[in-house]
Amino acid sequence: MKFDTVIMGGGLAGLLCGLQLQQHGLRCAIVTRGQSALHFSSGSLDLLSALPDGQPVTDITAGLDALCRQAPEHPYSRLGAQKVLTLAQQAQTLLNASGAQLYGDVQQAHQRVTPLGTLRSTWLSSPEVPVWPLSAQRICVVGVSGLLDFQAHLAAASLRQRDLNVETAEIDLPELDVLRDNPTEFRAVNIARLLDNEEKWPLLYDALSPIATNCDMIIMPACFGLANDTLWRWLNERLPCALTLLPTLPPSVLGIRLHNQLQRQFVRQGGIWMPGDEVKKVTCRRGTVSEIWTRNHADIPLRPRFAVLASGSFFSSGLVAEREGIREPILGLDVQQTATRAEWYQQHFFDPQPWQQFGVVTDDAFRPSLAGNTVENLYAIGSVLAGFDPIAEGCGGGVCAVSALQAAHHIAERAGEQQ
């Protein structure tokens, strides 16, 4: 099977890369093993929240300039501030075209409210998510009886520290009792599958309506809206106060929705989606990828002109930690890591951890190296890259988006030259 590009990994980076390549008229396939990290995320995307020295970032342009000085090997630093902003804006356009109407500005970070009621600087958020400063003084944090993925009293306690009048309440929906037989089934995603049925909408409205008459804003867990935000908009039009949603413990409704929107758009535009499959071997000849072998296709290889590695970091097994060191399991690419295992981590848990910055070594075009030699038609994007800390620096989503589009543009340019 011949393709212009085969992408190994179906997370945020892989999907955005595929969508951008389709804009250039290239035929793409994505090989994906299972759920991506988006399923376990908040559904919001960070661009740059803090510098390596811990300084918080509000002005993105100034932050990127400072990042270039502090961390010259960071993926953003390789591109330069203006290029990062341009690619981030293009990524936002791609997301919106896929139906993910995310709110945000590449020039200025905003503060979203987290499930614990604290604030986190971010780039893009779903319109349902409350953004600081809140537009209300009287707030009610509403939980769902029996839902363990969201603790209303914890969120309320944090918000009260910001001089807000915050109460808590709990709604009980007997229609959800079918899920209560097994506590592990009473999760936000399973609740959403029931509540997204249009016949159930009035039941949720009836439960929230008495609470809404006594406050200016309701904050509740995101336990509906797996496919779209239609129910949220329907409720906001009818309730006498604003309704906002907070992501829950994983799996996340908002994260799953974002992934599904991107995946459906990729397939709609003619992309080949290979779910439940796994790349077992990649054949390289004369410094280029020639064949990709997958578990499901056995002796039928995929033959791409270009290949993209978007396999993620440790969470997605894109990187594997072993006693002797860190390795990239598909091709055995060169990995940036510390000299000894003792240097992988810091003693204090909440300090920035060195292992977060481990990843494959690439050139400035994000082409990785194998035994010191660049693989000419292979690109590495997203969390598998080295040189950044997605947690401490708050840049995970941004690095995925920016590196994906940079690789896609580079591939499209080279593909045009080869025709």
From Swiss-Prot:
Single GO molecular function: glycerol-3-phosphate dehydrogenase (quinone) activity
Disulfide bond sites: none
Cofactor(s) recorded in Swiss-Prot or TrEMBL: FMN
Annotated localization: Cell inner membrane
Record's subunit section: Composed of a catalytic GlpA/B dimer and of membrane bound GlpC.
HAMAP family (UniProt xref): Glycerol3P_GlpB
Protein name: Anaerobic glycerol-3-phosphate dehydrogenase subunit B
Species this protein is from: Salmonella typhimurium (strain LT2 / SGSC1412 / ATCC 700720)
The encoding gene: glpB
